[in-house]
């Protein structure tokens, strides 16, 4: 068997296995499994190292908090601005997040938007419950993003030893 076949097989087993575990945990505990997959992508996008994953988790949760703030700020401005309150508040929030790209430590602007998307897609009202319902599967997804390359490398080495 070729090395490429072993690598693809290890990737299939590890990534597919972890994805199955995420879905099972989500169904078992009523978590938003799709948030874990978004966080997993954010972890891989950030480089899948411990410090980069921590920054990705922070950015994703900050994005979810930004989504909550949009929900909170839209309500009082609706009385004054009517149907234009949501677009204006969202425009200001997204614009401020986009400006973060200029700061070297805040370069994961797309991950902020992934967190905001996770909040809006959850359909939950703004509040702590929404943030907790996003934070728990986000941590699970970041853990999968960190574990996947480690487990894949471990499995590839074991397979290479068996095939020699």
Regions found by a protein language model. Give the residues of each.
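Alpha-helical transmembrane segments and their membrane-interface boundaries
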Residues: 1-49, 127-134, 142-164
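A cytosolic-side transmembrane-helix exit/cap motif
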Residues: 52-62, 104-113, 127-139, 156-162
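Alpha-helical membrane segments and adjacent membrane-interface helices in multi-pass membrane proteins
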Residues: 33-71
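Structural signature of hydrophobic alpha-helical transmembrane segments
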Residues: 23-37, 74-91
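Pore- and pathway-forming membrane helices of multi-pass small-molecule/ion transporters and channels
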Residues: 30-48, 95-126
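Internal alpha-helical transmembrane segments of multi-pass membrane proteins
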Residues: 77-112, 164
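Alpha-helical transmembrane spans of integral membrane proteins, capturing the lipid-embedded, hydrophobic core
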Residues: 12, 16, 20, 60-64, ...
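Alpha-helical membrane-inserting segments
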Residues: 18-26, 66-77, 96-100, 121-122, ...
